[in-house]
UniProtKB/Swiss-Prot annotation:
<dbReference type="InterPro" id="IPR020929">
    <property type="entry name" value="Ribosomal_uL5_CS"/>
</dbReference>
<dbReference type="GO" id="GO:0006412">
    <property type="term" value="P:translation"/>
</dbReference>
<keyword id="KW-0687">Ribonucleoprotein</keyword>
<dbReference type="InterPro" id="IPR031310">
    <property type="entry name" value="Ribosomal_uL5_N"/>
</dbReference>
<dbReference type="InterPro" id="IPR031309">
    <property type="entry name" value="Ribosomal_uL5_C"/>
</dbReference>
<dbReference type="GO" id="GO:0003735">
    <property type="term" value="F:structural constituent of ribosome"/>
</dbReference>
<keyword id="KW-0699">rRNA-binding</keyword>
<dbReference type="GO" id="GO:0005840">
    <property type="term" value="C:ribosome"/>
</dbReference>
<keyword id="KW-0689">Ribosomal protein</keyword>
<dbReference type="GO" id="GO:0019843">
    <property type="term" value="F:rRNA binding"/>
</dbReference>
<comment type="similarity">
    <text>Belongs to the universal ribosomal protein uL5 family.</text>
</comment>
<dbReference type="Pfam" id="PF00673">
    <property type="entry name" value="Ribosomal_L5_C"/>
</dbReference>
<protein>
    <recommendedName>
        <fullName>Large ribosomal subunit protein uL5</fullName>
    </recommendedName>
</protein>
<comment type="function">
    <text>This is one of the proteins that bind and probably mediate the attachment of the 5S RNA into the large ribosomal subunit, where it forms part of the central protuberance. In the 70S ribosome it contacts protein S13 of the 30S subunit (bridge B1b), connecting the 2 subunits; this bridge is implicated in subunit movement. Contacts the P site tRNA; the 5S rRNA and some of its associated proteins might help stabilize positioning of ribosome-bound tRNAs.</text>
</comment>
<dbReference type="Pfam" id="PF00281">
    <property type="entry name" value="Ribosomal_L5"/>
</dbReference>
<keyword id="KW-0820">tRNA-binding</keyword>
<comment type="subunit">
    <text>Part of the 50S ribosomal subunit; part of the 5S rRNA/L5/L18/L25 subcomplex. Contacts the 5S rRNA and the P site tRNA. Forms a bridge to the 30S subunit in the 70S ribosome.</text>
</comment>
């Protein structure tokens, strides 16, 4: 069983039940999924860019990547409908917990000039989104083998109803928010 899943069941649930005064264990917010998205605008001129980005995401998550395609044509960006323009992965279950553990304990501390994550990046429904400027903060990525430094979006979807509940959940895992 992943470490953070055990921490959630043994420490976080009782702490949040007391803090938020829930009447049932099922009311306690939980992390439902983590979505990683990498937009690859350069893929228009070079198809290998998408493959390299997908390989990076696969190495980070250990799961097959879905290539996202343009929904409609935009002449200003020289995009045609159906063009591959990015890739994404949705993690659930044990893979999600293992990734969350690596994100909090290993990857985020490796960010250069890190001062904490913005607390205002909640969406109003308890979900947290953050951006990463370079994929090399993850230990699975070999710095010598990458062709280009790419960023990605990471969204942590929770079952929380409000931002305060979502913030309390992530704080219980000692998520590195800016003070």
């Amino acid at each position: 069983m992943p470490k953070y899943k055990e921490v959630y069941q043994k420490e976080v649930i009782p702490a949040l039940m007391k803090e938020m005064s829930y009447s049932s264990v099922m009311q306690v917010p939980r992390i439902e999924k983590i979505t990683l998205n990498m937009g690859v605008g350069e893929a228009l001129g070079d198809k290998k860019q998408i493959e390299a980005a997908a390989a990076d995401l696969e190495a980070i998550t250990g799961q097959k990547v879905v290539v996202t395609k343009a929904r409609k044509s935009v002449a200003g960006f020289k995009i045609r409908q159906g063009f591959p323009i990015g890739c994404k992965v949705t993690l659930r279950g044990d893979r999600m917990w293992e990734f969350f553990e690596r994100l909090v304990d290993v990857a985020i501390p490796r960010v250069r000039d890190f001062r904490g994550l913005n607390q205002k990046s909640f969406d109003g429904r308890g979900n947290y989104s953050m951006g990463v400027k370079e994929q090399i903060i993850f230990p699975e990525i070999d710095y010598d083998k990458i062709d280009k430094v790419r960023g990605m979006d990471i969204t942590i979807t929770t079952s929380a109803n409000t931002d305060d509940e979502g913030r309390a959940l992530l704080n219980a895992f000692s998520f590195p928010f800016r003070k």
